[in-house]
């Protein structure tokens, strides 16, 4: 006779509801935050405050999208906060004028040149991280931790610990418009939010519609197997850190534009916020799992929670406690989710998987039904 084994029927009802709530936890957490703080403060979800909070979220979101690419490959980038600060300082330095003492002149680059040069700086910082990690086998934690101090120290050296103020520019010098990113809006929405949307769309297309996106997920799943399959693992690793640096530089430009000033301490601990946003969005720190949409939700959860605590007058120290608790809870829930998936996949009988059934005597897989006499 022929023996066959079927997978047990999956329970429905309450189980499905719990699974929906669990998988959509970032979205439901955001809704809960909005409801709670709207109850505690009538101005929390007013139009003006919502737009202000969204402009703050834009900075977190830009950092988190770059961090997502790194985490998808199984890496980590602790230098994004310092890269943000250094990028802002570079932009401020350029806006103040670059003196060429040999010729006795001072150059004032236009804003578009400042933006390009600052983005290039972020690419250089991220590229160095990537080369150290991919080609010199330096652990990502160590390489990016070192770059955190290098970038922050460079920002301090350039400013002597001071802040570049009044970055509006001068019409006579042709370098006005730097504050456009921070204060202007299109269709009633802050420009910084449009920048975040543009970067998110590019990231989504990159991960979903291109071979590069499949490579990123493959490396996070199993880097060795991906390399044996022909994936250019080292080049992809360098590129994700490079893109993370560019995203951090753009975030630095947005923040400096919003403040019309650039200080060497800007972005301190922002790397933790970026990691938190990615994890809250459902990404696995081990790599291979995560999405742009989830990361954006995570950024909104962090941003709306932080601003809500400020509005109701909670101390900045308690804000750190709440943020840390959210990170721990998010990591715990992710661990439960992915451990549960692993258990379910290993619990499925071999005969229910494609490729034939298993001989119930020998345990060998055959392409035809195993016959037991």
Regions flagged by a language model, labelled:
Residues 140-209, 236-239, 258-267, 343-373:
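Transmembrane helix-bundle core of multi-pass membrane transporters
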Residues 110-118, 122-129, 133, 187-263, ...:
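Helix-loop-helix "hairpin" substructures at the membrane interface of multi-pass membrane proteins
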Residues 16-53, 58, 253, 257-265:
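Helix-loop-helix hairpins and the membrane-proximal interhelical loops
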């Amino acid at each position: 006779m022929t023996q066959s084994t079927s997978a047990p029927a999956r329970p429905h009802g309450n189980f499905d509801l719990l699974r929906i709530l669990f998988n959509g936890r970032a979205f439901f957490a955001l809704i809960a935050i909005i409801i709670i703080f709207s109850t505690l403060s009538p101005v929390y979800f007013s139009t003006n405050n919502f737009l202000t909070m969204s402009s703050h979220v834009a900075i977190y979101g830009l950092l988190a999208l770059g961090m997502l690419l790194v985490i998808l490959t199984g890496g980590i980038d602790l230098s994004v906060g310092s890269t943000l600060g250094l990028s802002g300082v570079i932009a401020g330095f350029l806006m103040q004028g670059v003196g060429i003492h040999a010729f006795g002149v001072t150059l004032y680059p236009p804003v578009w040149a400042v933006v390009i040069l600052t983005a290039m700086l972020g690419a250089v910082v991220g590229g160095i991280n990537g080369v150290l990690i991919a080609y010199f086998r330096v652990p990502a934690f160590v390489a990016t931790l070192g770059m955190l101090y290098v970038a922050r120290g460079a920002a301090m050296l350039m400013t002597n610990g001071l802040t570049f103020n009044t970055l509006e520019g001068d019409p006579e010098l042709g370098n006005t418009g730097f504050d456009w990113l921070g204060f202007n809006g299109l269709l009633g929405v802050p420009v910084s939010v449009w920048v975040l949307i543009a970067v998110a769309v590019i990231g989504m297309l990159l991960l979903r519609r291109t071979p590069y996106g499949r490579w990123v997920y493959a490396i996070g799943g199993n880097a060795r197997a991906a390399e044996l399959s022909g994936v250019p693992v080292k080049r992809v690793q360098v590129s994700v850190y490079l893109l993370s640096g560019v995203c951090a530089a753009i975030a630095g430009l947005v923040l400096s534009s919003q403040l019309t000033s650039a200080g060497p301490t800007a972005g301190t601990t922002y790397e933790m916020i970026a990691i938190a946003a990615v994890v809250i969005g459902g990404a696995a720190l081990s790599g291979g799992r995560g999405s742009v949409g989830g990361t954006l939700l995570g950024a909104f959860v962090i941003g709306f929670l932080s601003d809500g605590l400020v509005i109701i007058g909670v101390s900045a120290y308690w804000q750190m406690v709440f943020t840390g608790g959210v990170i721990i809870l998010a990591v715990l829930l992710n661990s439960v989710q992915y451990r549960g998936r692993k258990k379910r996949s290993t619990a499925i009988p071999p005969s229910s998987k494609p490729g034939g059934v298993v001989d119930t005597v020998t345990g060998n897989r055959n392409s035809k039904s195993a016959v037991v006499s």
